[in-house]
Amino acid sequence: MEKLIILGAQWGDEGKGKIVDLLSEHFDITVRYQGGSNAGHTVVVNSQKFILHLLPTGILHEHVKGVIAQGMVVDLEVLHKEVKNLEEKGIYVKERLFISDRAHLVMPYHKLLDSLFEKKKGIGTTLRGIGPAYMFKYGRKGIRISDLKDEKRFYTLLEDNLDFVKNICEKVFCEKFDLDINQIYEEQLRYFEEFKENVVDLLRFFNTQKGSVLFEGAQGTLLDVDMGTYPYVTSSNASALGLSNGTGMPPKYFSDAFFLGVAKAYTTRVGEGPFPTELKGEEGEKLRELGGEYGSTTGRPRRCGWLDLVALKYAVQVNGLDGFVITKLDVLDTFDEVKVCVAYELDGEVIDYFPASYSELIRVKPVYKTLKGWKKSTKGAKDVSELPKEALDYVKFIEEYTGVPVVMLSTGPKRDEYIWLKEILRTRSGYS
């Protein structure tokens, strides 16, 4: 069984949606295994723009099965709207959608807590209840999709959780609590009724299915709850570390997989937290406008900066990457010079590693190498012969620094705007 894992190698928003859409056509199954509706994967098909928050991107292909695995936290209301939105555009996915019965639910009270926590701490959350949903999961107070099969048990769990949240709201935040248990109960059961035929035992599913599987990571390695810029991270393992517990399959299952990292030709970040190569002046604004750097989930402007190769090599080590896709190369087309960060300076010492300590990360200063810009459009290029030498030199420098081949370049948002550079992935995925 052929397996491909696609992972974000930066702080998310690397363009994974397009790459998954492009490659998943040649797979039988696509799987989302962590995160929730805080992710936003954007795909442009026949000039139509799709933004998927919960559904695997590959499900846009009519022969591909889509899996929402147990590592995700699922907002059934969002899922309902997403499926209906696709149906209105002539894309029907219900018959090909499989949802783990072990996946936890995002409830209205999680969103309430998210907004209260954000007011208090302000880490730049999407306010979609993802963090509190994971908090309840690991605090053993979560409600799983399988719990909705027993309506009496579901009501009891809901009652207990609402009492818990009410105390937090009133006694900790001095805020009014006005969520109605019966309304939540009825809404969740109504959504469950819509999707109950899609709910499966995922362990049995993986052990009985034949065919190739593409695993679609959400967010990015530097937002991983364990390996990212903690505490300014997401609440799940957004790196390869999340694969086994997110799917329920043992590590051995992934031993023959190809691990593909997706990275922009520069760096962006949404929300708060350390960002060593951030550009706050005209150059940062230029990157933002040329790259259209506004969040697909929140609409917030993204912080922009030069490519951070120290962080990118760290992502290689965390994930065991076999190859890279570099996206948005065309955004750099008009720059006279292009800088890449090759080391950090920390308290007068030059270091070549990505620190775990928050207090160190906010103190590091980037050490740059300046490369010559290409001053020629690469937008929409579909063959390597169309690329200027300086652009290829830029790609080669990334390969030499990270030790990982760049197998593909994305040169625009459309499905056909890409260039294969290496055959290593192309032959494995059957893509031509």
From Swiss-Prot:
A molecular function GO annotation: adenylosuccinate synthase activity
Recorded metabolic or biological pathway in which this protein acts: Purine metabolism; AMP biosynthesis via de novo pathway; AMP from IMP: step 1/2
Main location group: cytoplasm
Active site: D13, H41
Compartments where located: Cytoplasm
Keywords, sorted A to Z: Cytoplasm, GTP-binding, Ligase, Magnesium, Metal-binding, Nucleotide-binding, Purine biosynthesis
EC number: 6.3.4.4
A Pfam family of this chain: Adenylsucc_synt
One annotated Gene Ontology cellular component of this protein: cytoplasm
Residues engaged in binding GTP: 12-18, 40-42, 302, 328-330, 410-412
UniProt-annotated binding residues for Mg(2+): D13, G40
Residues holding substrate: S296, T297, T298, G299, R300, P301, R302
Source species, domain of life: Bacteria
Record-listed IMP binding positions: D13, E14, G15, K16, N38, A39, G40, H41, T126, R140, Q219, T234, R300
Assembly and binders: Homodimer.
NCBIfam families for this protein: PRK01117.1 (NF002223), PRK13783.1 (NF010355), purA (TIGR00184)
Family: Belongs to the adenylosuccinate synthetase family.
Main function: Plays an important role in the de novo pathway of purine nucleotide biosynthesis. Catalyzes the first committed step in the biosynthesis of AMP from IMP.
Name of the protein described by the UniProt record: Adenylosuccinate synthetase
Organism of origin: Aquifex aeolicus (strain VF5)
Lineage of producing organism: Bacteria, Pseudomonadati, Aquificota, Aquificia, Aquificales
Gene name of the record: purA
